[in-house]
């Protein structure tokens, strides 16, 4: 296929009016490498890389933690329709037996061209700090456990790419030292202070789970996890871009503080995403969704009800430059879990995960 005359998003964040060549599901460098010369006229359209969501629990009334193959497939189909072509289903804090079944589901689900591709699993619990549990069930939280993690990863067929860890919990140092070369260790759901977080980063935990949420605020005398992450140039940070979790001023300042290569936009979406107001569930707890805000009975925010593409558009509406927002939803998440060689930009050799939009970034077609 040859996609003609579109404004193609470049690796440097600029747009270039040019043709894009696709052969056997990969982007190639020239028309000479294309056997199927079918043309798609993209005049007046923007061409973006497919988005990469590394932190999402579910959508359209299904949750990864349901351990249901058909439900997971439905999630993947919804995500693809919304311009998300690479996806990390994300678990909640649950008993080990349930987690093993959940991770097996990701191995077994049937995927085709109608689905976002599972590029890894995000294991958000159970190695969290009860003080900052958020929407996770405290009774299932446990200390960091290397063998527990490895059993889960074995059930997942080695697909776990991310695991959240509270570095102030007993056993975290050993966990980080032992596993940081096997999985991306993400600091989150923690009351850790700056010193604790900085030491964990020094040991190899170079990712932060949904920055600002479920952690202490950054103070001028105690910078906490946020300050430690800002100070460590190798640390990447997730940020929920739904317009509910974080104030627009903080969103804009985060991009200024961390630059255009370290912010990873995530949806943190749950099963109410793509649905009407009503009652839903997350991690075994009832959630009320009203006007895109999902909360537990006590008012705790319980994930988002917004897909990543809409999160990206939301932060642009807050004043984040378009190029930075797109990079934060494509290249940065891909780099953060080590798959940028395959996805995240429209570069020859990579997967032809392509989203065509109008000038206002309304989706026209997803390839």
Where are these regions (language model features)?
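C-terminal cap of metal-dependent C-N hydrolases
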Residues: 6, 335, 345-367
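Histidine-rich, glycine-flanked metal-binding segment
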Residues: 1-48
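Di-metal (Zn2+ and/or Mg2+/Mn2+) metal-binding site signature of metallo-dependent hydrolases
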Residues: 45-69
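Active-site-adjacent C-terminal substructures of enzyme catalytic domains
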Residues: 196-324, 329, 335-340, 360-362
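Residue-level marker for buried hydrophobic side chains located in beta-strands
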Residues: 50-52, 186, 263-266, 355
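Divalent metal-binding pocket/active-site signature
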Residues: 123, 130-146, 150-224
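Divalent metal-dependent hydrolysis catalytic cores, especially in the metallo-beta-lactamase
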Residues: 57, 61, 73-102, 116-129, ...
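Active-site glycine- and acidic-residue-rich loops that bind
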Residues: 95-101, 168-170, 186-191, 240-252, ...
């Amino acid at each position: 296929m040859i996609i003609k005359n579109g404004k193609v998003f470049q690796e440097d964040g600029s747009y270039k009016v040019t043709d894009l060549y696709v052969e056997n599901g990969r982007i190639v460098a020239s028309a000479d490498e294309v056997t199927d010369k079918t043309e798609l006229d993209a005049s007046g359209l923007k061409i973006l890389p497919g988005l990469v969501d590394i932190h999402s629990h579910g959508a359209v009334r299904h949750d990864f933690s349901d351990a249901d193959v058909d439900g997971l497939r439905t999630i993947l189909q919804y995500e693809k329709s919304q311009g998300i072509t690479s996806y990390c289903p994300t678990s909640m804090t649950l008993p080990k037996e349930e987690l093993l079944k959940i991770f097996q589901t990701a191995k077994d689900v049937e995927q085709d061209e109608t689905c976002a591709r599972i590029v890894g699993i995000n294991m958000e619990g159970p190695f969290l700090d009860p003080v900052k549990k958020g929407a996770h069930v405290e009774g299932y939280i446990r200390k960091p456990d290397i063998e527990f993690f490895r059993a889960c990863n074995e059930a997942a067929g080695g697909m776990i790419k991310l695991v959240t860890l509270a570095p102030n919990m007993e056993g975290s140092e050993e966990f980080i030292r032992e596993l940081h070369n096997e999985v991306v260790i993400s600091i989150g759901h923690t009351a850790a202070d700056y010193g604790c977080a900085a030491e964990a980063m020094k040991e190899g935990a170079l990712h932060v789970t949904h920055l600002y949420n479920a952690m202490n605020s950054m103070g001028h005398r105690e910078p906490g996890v946020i300050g430690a992450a800002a100070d460590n140039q190798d640390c990447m940070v997730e940020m929920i871009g739904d317009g509910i979790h974080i104030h627009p001023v903080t969103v804009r300042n985060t991009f200024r503080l961390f630059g255009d290569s370290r912010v990873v936009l995530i949806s943190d979406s749950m099963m109410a995403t793509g649905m009407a107001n009503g009652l839903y569930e997350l991690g075994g707890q009832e959630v009320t969704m009203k006007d895109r805000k999902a909360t537990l009975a006590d008012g705790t925010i319980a994930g988002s009800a917004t897909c990543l593409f809409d999160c990206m558009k939301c932060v642009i509406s807050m004043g984040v430059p378009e190029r930075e927002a797109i990079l934060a939803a494509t290249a940065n998440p891909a780099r953060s879990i080590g798959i940028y060689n395959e996805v995240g930009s429209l570069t020859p050799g990579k997967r032809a995960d392509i989203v065509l939009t109008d000038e206002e970034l309304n989706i026209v077609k997803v390839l």
